[in-house]
From Swiss-Prot:
Pro residues: bias regions: 344-355
Keyword Membrane assigned: yes
Keyword Acyltransferase among record annotations: no
Identification of the protein by name: Interleukin-11 receptor subunit alpha
Gene: Il11ra1
Organism classification: Eukaryota, Metazoa, Chordata, Craniata, Vertebrata
Keywords assigned by UniProt, alphabetized: Disulfide bond, Glycoprotein, Immunoglobulin domain, Membrane, Receptor, Repeat, Secreted, Signal, Transmembrane, Transmembrane helix
Sequence ranges assigned to domain Fibronectin type-III in this UniProt record: 112-219, 220-317
Topology, Extracellular side: 24-371
Sites where a glycan is attached: 127, 194
Length: 431
């Protein structure tokens, strides 16, 4: 009894749903033919594919003779299922009033798309690529629509729909799923990426604004080689090349960082070399060393690249540098010779006395002598002029005023001086 009531309730709900959606057309084919899609917990409408619209049909589950919906339901060629769940997935068969086979429909359940997760990266200064992943697994066939446009400055409304700003399609990589590539981008411009996920139950869009100089991440350097330096048991020479994806231009260069460590040592030593090679001078003698290198834009745009594959090298175990014959000098001698050709080094000082006599005709020595004579002459003239000025001043002051007593005059009374009479007034002098 309860089962019959539940069945009746199910039919009534289906009829009500059908009446509400009677004007809704059948879902368009999406994916393989004869397959329709629905969402758990929602009503689903199936259409008989082999009859005209409105033709009454009977519906059965494939392999089951029990009638699901008769031709007198008033729904014509459509079957409505209310609040479907995983038990409703499968194949349904429709037949006309005279029992002619009308077709088969397979129902698959899933979820509508969620907002996809998008990230972009540039491996050079002209092109960038974007990859994405679904926000959730829908269980349904999915397509992605990708496009981009160049963003305009605030207030430039006249250029917002200009052909020079897009939108343009972002071509999807046929060899790599969920990836599209933008070619010929402007390094200092900002772009808006549109990735829309579409499945039979709907669509969801993600918009991402990117700047090329922010998402720049070069590929790792290539061709890393590590070589020993003959005669130097603590040296290694490492060299590498630019990544093939980076077009070398004078104003778009890369800088590098290099890490190395001896075998069985977990800690890395890091240096930032200048150019495409580095001479390691503190290697551990006799141990193999792992070396790796990464790259970044010379002006620090973006981020460092991933590390290159490790290369291994062991320092030289031969005789020391001073014991190496001239004919067997290694790579370091070539580097030193090339450096001397480009910029010859000054000769090293000698400890032996020079037997050659001094050449006083040296222009530098003559200039030094003349400078010394000039300084002494100036000082002599200055002292002479000062002495002459003092003498003239004293002479002029002696002619203009009365003569002053001598140096000893204040010390000896005048009447005691020999040959000078006593001029003091006494009564004898006036008598």
């Amino acid at each position: 009894m309860s089962s019959s009531r539940s069945g009746l309730t199910r039919v009534l709900v289906a009829v009500a749903t059908a009446l509400v959606s009677s004007s809704t057309p059948c879902p368009q084919a999406w994916g393989p033919p004869g397959v329709q899609y629905g969402q758990p917990g929602r009503p689903v409408m199936l259409c008989c594919p082999g009859v005209n619209a409105g033709t009454p049909v009977s519906w059965f589950r494939d392999g089951d003779s029990r009638l699901l919906q008769g031709p007198d339901s008033g729904l014509g060629h459509r079957l409505v299922l209310a609040q479907v769940d995983s038990r409703d997935e499968g194949t349904y068969v429709c037949r006309t009033l005279d029992g002619v086979f009308g077709g088969m429909v397979t129902l698959k359940l899933g979820s509508p798309p969620a907002r996809p997760e998008v990230s972009c990266q540039a491996v050079d200064y002209e092109n960038f690529s974007c990859t994405w992943s679904p926000g959730r697994v829908s269980g349904l066939p999915t397509r992605y629509l990708t496009s981009y446009r160049k963003k305009t400055l605030p207030g430039a409304e006249s250029q917002r729909e200009s052909p020079s700003t897009g939108p343009w399609p972002c071509p999807q990589d046929p060899l790599e799923a969920s990836r599209c590539v933008v070619h010929g981008a402007e390094f200092w411009s900002e772009y808006r990426i549109n990735v829309t996920e579409v499945n039979p139950l709907g669509a969801s869009t993600c918009l991402l604004d990117v700047r090329l100089q922010r998402i720049l991440r070069p590929d790792p350097p290539q061709g890393l080689r590590v070589e020993s330096v003959p005669g130097y048991p603590r040296r290694l020479h490492a060299s590498w090349t630019y990544p093939a994806s980076w077009r070398r231009q004078p104003h778009f260069l890369l800088k590098f960082r290099l890490q190395y460590r001896p075998a069985q040592h977990p800690a890395w030593s890091t240096v930032e070399p200048i150019g495409l090679e580095e001479l390691i001078t503190d290697a551990v003698a006799g141990l193999p060393h792992a070396v790796r290198v990464s790259a970044r834009d010379f002006l620090d745009a973006g981020t460092w690249s991933a590390w290159s594959p490790e290369a291994w090298g062991t320092p030289s175990t031969g005789p020391l540098r001073d014991e190496v014959p001239d004919g067997s000098r290694g790579h370091e001698q070539k580097l030193e010779a090339a450096a001397q050709e480009d910029s010859p080094a000054p000769p090293s000082p000698s400890l032996q006395p020079d037997p050659r006599p001094l050449d006083h005709r040296d222009p530098l020595e003559q200039v030094a002598v003349l400078a010394s004579l000039g300084i002494f002459s100036f000082l002599g003239l200055a002292v002479g002029a000062l002495a002459l000025g003092l003498w003239l001043r004293l002479r002029r002051s002696g002619k203009d005023g009365p003569q002053k007593p001598g140096f000893l005059a204040p010390m000896i009374p005048g009447d005691k001086l020999p040959g000078i009479p006593n001029l003091q007034r006494t009564p004898e002098n006036f008598s």
